[in-house]
Amino acid sequence: MIMLSNGMESRVGTVGAKWEFFHEWKRLTEMDHGNIELPTMLRGICKKENLIDLIENFILFDHSGGTTVKILARNHQYLGVNQAVEMYRHRDVMKGKLGVFWHTQGSGKSYSMVFLAQKIRRKFEGSPTIVVLTDRDELNKQISDTFENCGLLGGLKAKQFIAQSGDDLREKLMGNPSFVFSLIQKFNKADAEPIRPDHDIIVMSDEAHRTQNRIGFTGTPLLRDDNITARTFGQYVSIYDFKRAVEDKATVPLYYENRGEKLQELKNPKINEEIAARLDEEELTPSQQAKLEREFAQEVHLLTAEKRLRVVAHDFVRHYSDVWTSGKAMVVSFNKVTCVRMYNYVQEYWQKEIEEIRKKTEKDASQQEVQELKRKLKWMEETEMAVVVSQEQNEIQTFKKWHLDITPHREKMEKRELDKEFKDADNRLRVVFVCAMWLTGFDVKTLSCLYIDKPMKAHTLMQTIARANRVAEGKTNGLVIDYIGIVKALRQALADYT
């Protein structure tokens, strides 16, 4: 652990960490406004019990990605986790409700869950079982991998701790495992005999559900009418909101640009509140998706028309090739078929842009201009793109109706670890096309440009734009590009969730 200060400003980090990951320690309690001067850091870190606590419970070694990174808790994580620990200490008084842990997306919520689990299992008798709940397979894998890579699973593979079925979950809970990772859907036997363990079970719910001793982790706050979550988990145990995270440089600011309204040839459907809410529904089955598209056939037709998609694809190529040094990009489309169509159109315009740049290098230009064009040309030629969508039954036939072939995309998704490639700053996979996957709980620090061409609102919109707010070396901000017209929904979401 290294502390750096000139007296007026102070930061703390770990040996070998880049400057972007040295952070301020400017609060002694969550209520403090914040003071970046040295005395605050000295009182917060160097006080004997705090220093011992930090060294013992708030340092991790993350072995993901083939390298080992030393992680020191940030100020907000240290304060929030310790408040949650105190709630657990008084769990009988709290009737098992440990509260809602609201730390905004991108501020290290997964690490906070690891810190909390680590400290409780070290400092309290009885070795409580910690059950981590999510509602998607990809999130379940991500959080279990985080626990494994940070060494909390005793050198064992995360797969051994994942409940594969409702029966497997029940069998695991009847034992005394250190950890269980499960989808909430696995609790599917409401009439089964209750399990009565002789030890504590702590349920950490990523976006909140009902259990024994329980704490709900969330990246967005409870809305005023969300009484179920409050009744289940209790009130907030820790708050670290969107604005404070940006002020503390725990996340980078997000800049918004409405490019859709600048494109005169772009014909957008009129999306009212009802349509936006329905189109925004997550994880629809193929039959539900088909029913939805029939119900709003006119709007969907306009949204997915070839002429419109080509306008968006062409503008994406022009824009992203202009900001090519900024980082990686994610394109969010309406559905799986549209993702593949957008991929094809972008490939077409990408190659045309490459040809245009080649022609420019052959024209009269200064040596400096030619060198810059050649650098850009090399980058564009090397850049790889991928479609990332979940698999469904009869998908080959579904795509054939649109004269599309999903097979090469599916093979790429199955044979390669696209998530790891996209997270690797040096990997040539720089653009992904998604509609639902990777929009929540997927942390890519070098993702800087998010292109939205799908109606979204509220919680889903906030989760999505947060993909671009992670801190990375040389990254000053994330950019949200709007083609569909989400500005009203974005204002409402920011009002509700920040």
Segments the model singles out, each with a brief description of its role:
Residues 1-129, 138-154, 175-179, 185, ...:
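ATP-dependent helicase/translocase motor core
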Residues 467-494:
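Conserved segment of the helicase C-terminal RecA-like domain
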Residues 137-164, 348-354:
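Conserved helix-turn-beta segment of the N-terminal RecA-like "Helicase ATP-binding" lobe
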Residues 433-434, 438-455, 461-463, 478-482:
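A short beta-strand element within the Helicase C-terminal
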Residues 105, 209-225, 249:
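Conserved helicase ATPase motor motifs in RecA-like P-loop NTPase domains
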